[in-house]
Amino acid sequence: MKKEFKVISELIENKSKALDVGCGDGELIKYLIENKTKDIRGLEISKESVQNCLSKGLSVIEGNAENDLMQFPNHSFDYVILSQTLQAFLNP
């Protein structure tokens, strides 16, 4: 477990809805499912990473956060997580 997973977990209320933007290998999603909330999804730009997450049974879709976040209706999530992601945005 990465050190920041515990910190992120402490900020999220139990049984809340969360989206992990740029979820990569899905390890944070897996950690949060096991320790905090079952209702968490991921958005990832890498097709290979998405396939890897799906093979682990994680709810992840392929998309570019700068363009595809709009597909989610307002108030879909209680938390949106950008762990190691914000620096990749062109216009943060």
For each predicted feature, which ranges?
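Short catalytic micro-motifs in class I SAM-dependent methyltransferases
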Residues: 84-85
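A short, conserved alpha-helix within the catalytic core of class I
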Residues: 89-92
